[in-house]
């Protein structure tokens, strides 16, 4: 099935979305962390913590962090969960290069590694991981259904899937305030700090188009997962999705 966000691309209508997303993140990689924390007022750190805390009772030893970017989630997860290995995958080498430096600085390079992977065609064998995490990345998938099915394939039986994704508040006045923030503040700050206005115009557009709440949980179930649930965080600005294979 095609979803609205799959048609939204950072730069033009001609090139494949995955190619443009890779180019976009390579472009903004140097400024990404600063801008990401600024735009979320550092609340993104607490969102990651909630996702990681849900995984803690299951003691996953082999974790894949999809769309790992600069490794923020991977580092935080490794420090809390202490897995044997954590593999961060992404299509952007620019983002992962920043992540590799951060992992080395944190002294975690013996446990965290990075691999360039297309989430819709993973190179890992079936039932490879105890847990898979995706923080702020699923709306960039070129094919959401295919990406979810691939994650299901490489998860062990009873393995856990955790997805964090930005979302739109749906109640007054937060919905109206968020609309102004996303249409004016995000693109303006994005242009100032990253020099790539298109990337931060694409961000709110892709959030608006992405399936949320019950619709997203139905999509996750269709990929083969069960025990699917979601929690809205910070007045609905972010949503946490939880599932089991």
Swiss-Prot record:
Keyword tRNA-binding: no
Matching Pfam families: Ubie_methyltran
Entry binding sites for S-adenosyl-L-methionine: 70, 90, 118-119
Catalytic activity: a 2-demethylmenaquinol + S-adenosyl-L-methionine = a menaquinol + S-adenosyl-L-homocysteine + H(+)
Pathway assigned to this chain's UniProt record: Quinol/quinone metabolism; menaquinone biosynthesis; menaquinol from 1,4-dihydroxy-2-naphthoate: step 2/2
InterPro entries, per database record: SAM-dependent_MTases_sf, UbiE/COQ5_MeTrFase, UbiE/COQ5_MeTrFase_CS
Protein's name according to its UniProt entry: Demethylmenaquinone methyltransferase
Record organism: Phocaeicola vulgatus (strain ATCC 8482 / DSM 1447 / JCM 5826 / CCUG 4940 / NBRC 14291 / NCTC 11154)
Gene: menG
